[in-house]
From Swiss-Prot:
Organism annotation: Ranoidea chloris (Red-eyed tree frog)
Keyword set, alphabetical order: Amidation, Amphibian defense peptide, Secreted
Cellular component per GO, a single term: extracellular region
Protein name: Caeridin-1.4
Keyword Secreted among UniProt keywords: yes
Length: 12
């Protein structure tokens, strides 16, 4: 997600 960084970072 937007705050995930490790998972998406870009909202993906």
């Amino acid at each position: 997600g937007l705050l995930d960084g490790l998972l998406g970072g870009l909202g993906l």
